[in-house]
UniProtKB/Swiss-Prot annotation:
Coiled coil: none annotated. InterPro entries: FA_synthesis, Phospholipid_synth_PlsX-like. It comes from Pectobacterium atrosepticum (strain SCRI 1043 / ATCC BAA-672). The keyword Heme does not apply. Signal peptide: none annotated. This is Phosphate acyltransferase. It catalyses: a fatty acyl-[ACP] + phosphate = an acyl phosphate + holo-[ACP]. GO terms for biological process: fatty acid biosynthetic process; phospholipid biosynthetic process. Disulfide bonds: none annotated. Homodimer. Probably interacts with PlsY.
């Protein structure tokens, strides 16, 4: 099996090394061909490795970093002051050829800006997009982009996102001729902003894209499309809403449906039935847990960069690491570049 080396921004996110280091060890234990470069403050990382098996330690290296980019820092300021930070060093490891991908739970805007600066976009791509794969009710998955990298998008960018999303659906989900839709406020052709209508017209004229038209937000998890395209503002709000609803739903399955007084009045068999239903429903809908699809790929770069949710726990960050491995092994940047060369005009 081909060995992979990934760089992890160990200091990024809400919890830093307390989450990233255990997640890294979990990924190493599950993947014997994986090597990891943990970028961050050795004083914060090393104590968490004290009782780790020697085999795992042999595939792990701590790369020192002087500082960390704050999650609330303005991207422009963070980029100017980024030298010596864990995020920048992790990205530089890709640029220098020491790592094949980077995973960070840090500041999204800073990660986007530094990735464009250091890794560079693919030929024909104006701006990379954050993309994730979400489960739907038909027991399949849908590629969704942009999830927050670009708040404002013109029609050309939306078409580029559609091309990249289509390639990802083919390579990661192994779909043939994946369906592509634009997220809009209605399915009628006259609905939506001018940029969306212009993108729709261009997609209709792109033979390599199986464009099926507009879909609304309530269609996101129905399985009506394999790729859903939108600007970063709409995508981020949509993703956070879906995650919030799913977490609420799963928490309701695990908690009593009635108050303390009603709970005391229930007979033993009703209590038993309630626990049984909670267990079965939790198992039935557990695949919707946002932790299981954490990690958005910054698609459109010459290398692989994965953005983990800032509030990710150990399990979720480990999923982001797995996604980075899958993206590298599928050679996604190279395959997107080949498709772009065939269907999009080169930028001047």
């Amino acid at each position: 099996m081909t060995r992979l080396t990934l760089a992890l921004d160990a200091m990024g996110g809400d919890f830093g090394p307390c989450v990233t280091v255990p997640a890294a060890l979990q990924a190493l234990a599950s993947n014997p061909a994986l090597n990891l470069l943990l970028v961050g403050d050795p004083a914060a990382i090393t104590p968490l490795l004290a009782k780790v098996d020697s085999d795992l330690l042999s595939r792990l290296e701590v790369v020192p970093a002087e500082s960390v980019i704050a999650s609330d820092a303005r991207p422009s300021q963070a980029i100017r002051a980024s030298r010596g930070t864990s995020m920048r060093i992790a990205l530089e490891l890709i640029k220098d050829g020491r790592a094949q991908a980077c995973v960070s739970a840090g500041n999204t805007g800073a990660l986007m800006g530094l990735a464009k600066l250091l890794i560079k976009p693919l030929e024909g791509i104006e701006r990379p997009a954050l993309v994730s794969v979400l489960p739907h009710q038909q027991h399949g998955k849908t590629v969704v982009l942009d999830l927050g990298a670009n708040v404002e998008c013109d029609s050309t960018m939306l078409v580029q996102f559609a091309v990249m999303g289509s390639v990802m659906a083919e390579e990661v989900l192994e779909l043939t001729n994946p369906r592509v839709a634009l997220l809009n406020i209605g399915e009628e052709e006259s609905k939506g902003l001018s940029t969306i209508r212009e993108a729709a017209a261009q997609l209709k004229e792109t033979p390599s894209i199986n464009y099926i038209g507009y879909l609304e937000g309530n269609d996101l998890l129905t399985g009506k499309t394999d790729v859903m395209v939108c600007d970063g503002f709409v995508g981020n709000v949509t993703l956070k809403t879906v995650e919030g609803v799913v977490r609420m739903f799963l928490s309701l399955l695990k908690s009593p449906a009635s108050g303390p007084e009603q709970k005391q009045k229930r007979s033993w068999w009703l209590k038993w039935l309630g626990r049984l239903l909670q267990k079965r429903l939790s198992k039935r809908f557990g695949h919707l847990n946002p932790d299981q699809y954490n990690g958005a790929c910054l698609l459109g770069l010459r290398g692989t960069v994965i953005k983990s949710h800032g509030a990710a726990n150990q399990r979720a960050f480990a999923v982001a690491i797995e996604q980075a491995m899958q993206t590298v092994r599928r050679q996604l940047p190279e395959r997107i570049a080949a498709r772009l060369e065939a269907v999009l005009p080169k930028s001047d």
